């Protein structure tokens, strides 16, 4: 049994039909006995749509406070995709859970909109994987 990490981009996550196809692919690997970690992007065009809304509200805003909110906004696209994929995996009969970055937790530096990961505490992920969940 191997630990396998799949990354799916916005096009692969672009509709419920495509999310269902990703879930079927991931479920196939999980049923073969592999531990699966899936990292989905936001649905195609969603990040641009969300950031476009922010620019309509404050087109030339600068500073850490604004950058922080842009990061919070952009993350919602990935959070939605993660939850939708977990739901699709559950529909395929798989135990699955999604996380927001703070739930893992993933720690970054404070370079808003260009942050770098400093650490990942993978204890929760490993625990859920050991219990047979797709994460």
Could you describe each region identified by the protein language model?
Residues 1-135:
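Nucleotide/pyrophosphate-binding catalytic subdomain
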């Amino acid at each position: 049994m191997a630990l396998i990490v799949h990354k799916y981009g916005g096009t692969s996550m672009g509709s419920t039909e495509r999310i269902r196809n990703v879930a079927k692919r991931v479920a196939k690997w999980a049923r073969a006995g592999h531990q699966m970690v899936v990292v989905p992007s936001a649905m195609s065009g969603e990040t641009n749509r969300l950031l476009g809304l922010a620019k309509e509200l404050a087109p030339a805003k600068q500073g850490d406070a604004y950058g922080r909110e842009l990061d919070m906004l952009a993350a919602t696209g990935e959070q939605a995709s993660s939850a939708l994929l977990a739901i699709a995996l559950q529909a395929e009969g798989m135990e699955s859970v999604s996380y927001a970055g703070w739930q893992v937790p993933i720690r970054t530096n404070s370079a808003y909109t260009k942050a770098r990961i400093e650490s990942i505490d993978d204890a929760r992920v490993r625990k859920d994987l050991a219990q047979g969940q797709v994460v």
